[in-house]
Amino acid sequence: MGYGVAQKRAKVTNSIAKVSEKTLNVGANANPAQALAGAVAGVKVDITSGSPSATPSITIRGGSNYDGGSNEPLVIVDGVIRSSLSDINPNDIESMEVMKDAGATALYGARAGNGVIMITTKQGKNGKASVSFNAKVGLNYYNLGYNMCSDEDYLYYYRLALQNCEWTLPGGKYASAYNSNLYGTNNPGGIGRTELSQGQSYNILRKTDDNAYLLQKGWSEMLDPVSDNYILYRNIDPLEMNGRTPYVTQDYNASISGGNDRGRYYASLGLYDADGFIKGTFYKRYNFALTGSYKITKWLESNSVFNYTRSNWLNDDPMLDTGYFMNRGQAFKFVRYRDEDGNDLYGTGGPTTNVNVNNGNFDRDFQADKFSMTQSLTATLLPGLTLKGTMSWYYNEEYDESFNHQYINSQAGAVNPNGNNGVNRSYNTSASFSRYFDQTYNLVANFNRVFAEKHTVNVMAGTEFYKRRYRGFSAGGYGAPTGYFPGLGLTQNDADVQSRSMSSFHNEEALLSYFGRAEYDYMDKYLFAATFRADGYSRLVNNKWGTFPGVSGGWVFSKENFWNKLGMENIINYGKLRASYGMNATINSSYLGYYTLQGSYSAYKYDGVYGYRVSTLPNPNLKWEKTRTAEVGLDLGFLNNRFNLGLTYYNRLTMDKYSALSLPRTTGFSTVTYNNGQYRNAGIEFDLQGTLLRTRDFQWTFNANITYNKNTIVKLPENGLQNNRQGGSEVYTGNGDETHYVGGYQEGQTPGSFVGYGVVKMARSQADIDALGDYIDTGVSNGAAVYANEAGRQRLLAMGYTNLVQLMPGDFIYEDRNGDNWVEAKDRKVLGNLTPKWTGGFNTTLTWKGLSLYARFDMGFDFQVYDSNIAFWLGEGQGAMAFNDAVRDTWTPDNPGAKYPRVVWASQYGTDNYIRTNSFFTQNGSYLACRELQLSYVLPKSICQKLACQGITVSVTGQNLGYIKSCTIPLPDHTTYTSGNTAGWGGTYNVPRTLLFGLNVTF
């Protein structure tokens, strides 16, 4: 329950879920949060990146923010508040509890508005020393998630896409405006280049007798579908240049523990070493933990916990832009990464860069060191009365350093690295250092007694002081005379060239708290608890103090005499009704920065004079963001607790939530943080655990949960607009010219909706177009206007449109919602919502003798996703994108019944079948994901004894094995959302599939 107060499960009157040690340690996870997906009702884990250093996001019961604020719960490890779970070794965790309702989390007051994750690390146990060694080695397989089309198919459809464009390209009808090296310019045949030059960017040529020899050097040929020429081409997969698959993850842990009646100890060492998909990227973490307890006297006990973590990482290559994984599948084929003699070339930049040309040219050193120490003394003053004093220190230091030697940044530099073209010699160098130090001191008294063998009283009271000091600086520069030394002092910095920059920051915050909890139960049947906390927070200037009460109660009706008289005890042996109500707050909000309330300042120079100005507008009157939660629940045990069922209804209201208010530009500020209304999450949680089958040698157990959650914006500040809306789009309701606003944020609406055009059908033939009359469409992404016939064209001209494109067979016909035969922005509608209404998961274990099969799944239902990737590829959004295999099912005169519209080069400048958000690419996002599947075997004791050990377990595990889904996007549990108007799968760093081999030995 927190602050060292233990409580029996049967007496718990709040929503507290415990995560098993097995769940946390089946796979190789850099972050324990990865193992929570689908493990706890009401907890949603978004694993949004396959980067080995990625930090999953955790949301409990829908969170308290919908507009960009943090929904992360409070993380407490051995009494120490942590910023995240990222530096915690899962192998050191003894127990993890998720506190969800305010009746429980009110004890942590101002920081627990999004729930609490409480972790207790392993402690020593009485007995002789036990030594354990655990090793896991995994092979990670990169998964793009789409089947891209073959080289020949790509060229075939790309050339048709050029032929289908209705406008004149700068270089001729069949020439690509993307790059003159690709197809040539001013050439009606479309492919002008016939000679292969060293500096050429693409392996594309028009075949001639002089270059036919390339067919003997790995090139291929095909007939150009729009001319009588043959095309020579050679493709080198960017994966071969920049990536690696499989790539390796290693996880090693060793521990020793033991103890006796006077003292106990536990010590561990851990190494987690994971390569990334991009060559040279990695995440490495070293862990050391030491815990000990010692009875100084009969009435005084000491407990000590020490943890140290060092992390090193490199997340990406400097030459690959941040959009690499978005563009990895989109990148144009046939980039010239290597010449015919096997020499590396540069490529074309961005996602199509060959990182091998710059091996050793970039120095990167990113390192974080984290220490935590907790020391407590517990004194037993009287029977049942204890006094515990605890001090906790948490130190987090990060140092980042970067230096660029001479490096190649174009194809010309790869051809001639000693020349002046395509070579960067600016020798950029930078370094940054940050440090924060958290101190927590608390004193807690606890009284626990049983009176007359019926009345149990447990009272706790305490006070706590928390302080954080955060310091840091950064500096950078360029223009050093040499690339051999990375010193900032060598960079050029004179009156003509100011190449150096530097900054620093100094921040502090403090929290003073008083808290207490009282529990009473009568004969384990009637349960009551009350919690109170008062917090004073330094950042809230005029509203420092907040109070956070919580109450809960329970009735174990299965202990009543009438239950036995009904004869139910043999079926439902345990039954408890519970209810709770409480309040807490959120101060770990991303909106509540160090300078949010008092303002910040920056230097400036005007007319030769230096001064300073306010750069962040302060808001000293900001109030506490409070969360009020009420819940009722029912816990049942069946067949002597062989099966256990839990049902909970919760209703959580976030009041005075933090948000950023946009300000007029005339104020000189972009935003100010303010209290922005009320937000409600309400839902139902179901938990079911049990043993399906048990014999002497065989056992089958399972654990399942599912949650329904609905979130609603209840109240926004009065602004005179409909539903006090913030943002949104005006659209027709479907009732004539009547309009309303959708998207954005509005009272009474659910955030997460996205807006787009409804697709009526695809024009399969000219007859479908002729039936449209004077139909016009001005909803094109880039300002063009579409007409069906001459009457529509004249209509557009009269409206002032000049960039006109005719609707063709193979194009979409969009929904006209007000009946004026004109598709415009107001004809859009809500296409779906990106937030699953139902989430959950289940795991199951089948054990036969020493053999065990374990599987873990999570799921989400009743929501929509938008596949913007296929739309962007087939729409040729930048004029030169790759195609996935859906291109084979696009409309052509020979395939009028195709699923997808015709492919047109740079579709957004034409009829825009693909780039604009529409209902065609809106899909059901429901999914079932297989997170882990493990087969393990415990060797017989007779074999272990011969090997001088107590136990040996070997295992093979598959992680992130895939989804059962109907949508086309690879990760239906990860979508993007912006103000209710746009949606899509952004093409992130996909989570890899992993094959993991494990060994655990205990001595």
Please provide the spans of the model-predicted regions.
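Short, small/polar-rich motifs associated with maturation and membrane association
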Residues: 1-275, 279-289, 296, 301-303, ...
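Extracellular/periplasmic, surface-exposed regions of secreted and cell-surface proteins
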Residues: 14, 21-29, 71-74, 285, ...
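Glycine-rich phosphate/pyrophosphate-binding loops
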Residues: 42, 51, 264-266, 848-868
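Short, glycine/acidic-rich beta->alpha junctions
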Residues: 77-80, 99-102, 111-115, 248, ...
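Conserved small-residue
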Residues: 132-227, 474-475, 674, 693-830
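Extracytoplasmic gating/loop element in the C-terminal half of outer-membrane beta-barrel translocons
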Residues: 229, 410-412, 495, 537, ...
